Amino acid sequence: MFRLLLLALSCLESTVFMASVSISRSKPVGIVGGQRTPPGKWPWQVSLRMYSYEVNSWVHICGGSIIHPQWILTAAHCIQSQDADPAVYRVQVGEVYLYKEQELLNISRIIIHPDYNDVSKRFDLALMQLTALLVTSTNVSPVSLPKDSSTFDSTDQCWLVGWGNLLQRVPLQPPYQLHEVKIPIQDNKSCKRAYRKKSSDEHKAVAIFDDMLCAGTSGRGPCFGDSGGPLVCWKSNKWIQVGVVSKGIDCSNNLPSIFSRVQSSLAWIHQHIQ
């Protein structure tokens, strides 16, 4: 089994939880504090791939979610540039193990949120259109999106899923099975206080805006390779995606991680997928 190429990409404020395909070699990427997940439990989860000439294969760089039979939602920082060529990306669906013998799906179009800011990570969202409609099944189906009027808080049952590192320097081992972890949503005011209480300038500089959502606790949350993945909550007898993994510091070590809030971009999402 070949190795994933990972890089902790630092921005001015924090670290994005993205795997890299071009800089250095390390073992492949699971969620901090998580457990293995069985097939079919999270049928909207996808692995976003880019081709690596170093290992001559399509390697995992980010997570994503199926929100429509032809559309994937992920993080904007997972995409190389505003005019990125869709042909350099592929998507794996319906599988809990990375790198099983499976046909990867082609992307025909990429749309980055028009208000995305690469420094602050505001509106860190991107849509990817598949070249063909998915055939839904037990293992492949879209997740529900929230309503504008929906509310989510620490009392909700919310889960994060991904193939990211188990700890900052502890990658997932073969067979690279998808991991899940239950994490609490935190209100933005408490999240801001938590960051400002830290002594380092890096922590204090983190800005949390209304289009962001905080979730996770010490030892439970996303790490490198989890960017773009969905945060889902059980509400009204269905799973609803409330967030997209965006940024954090030290792989969920002491602080909540920061997600893009899906509700803040519903109009933009529906404009393109309908």
UniProtKB/Swiss-Prot annotation:
Pfam family, one: Trypsin
Cellular component GO terms, alphabetical: extracellular region; extracellular space
Active site annotation, chain numbering: H77 (charge relay system), D124 (charge relay system), S227 (charge relay system)
Regulation: Inhibited by benzamidine, (4-amidino-phenyl)-methane-sulfonyl (APMSF), N-p-tosyl-L-lysine chloromethylketone (TLCK), gabexate, mesylate, BABIM and trypsin soybean inhibitor (TSI).
EC code: 3.4.21.-
Tissues and organs where the protein is expressed, per its UniProt entry: Expressed in embryos throughout the preimplantation period, during blastocyst hatching and embryo outgrowth. Found in uterus especially in glandular epithelium.
All copies of domain Peptidase S1, residue ranges: 31-274
A single GO BP: proteolysis
Leading EC class: hydrolase
Compartment annotation: Secreted
The UniProt record lists the keyword Protease: yes
Keyword list, A-Z: Disulfide bond, Glycoprotein, Hydrolase, Protease, Secreted, Serine protease, Signal
Listed SMART domains: Tryp_SPc
Disulfide bond sites: C62-C78, C158-C233, C191-C214, C223-C251
Signal peptide: 1-26
Induction (record text): By progesterone.
Residues bearing carbohydrate: N106
A GO term for molecular function: serine-type endopeptidase activity
Chief location of this protein within or outside the cell: secreted
Subunit structure: Homooligomer, heterodimer and heterotetramer. Able to form homo- and hetero- tetrameric structures. Heterotetramer is far more stable than the homotetramer.
Entry similarity comment: Belongs to the peptidase S1 family.
Chain's role: Involved in embryo hatching and implantation.
This protein's name: Serine protease 28
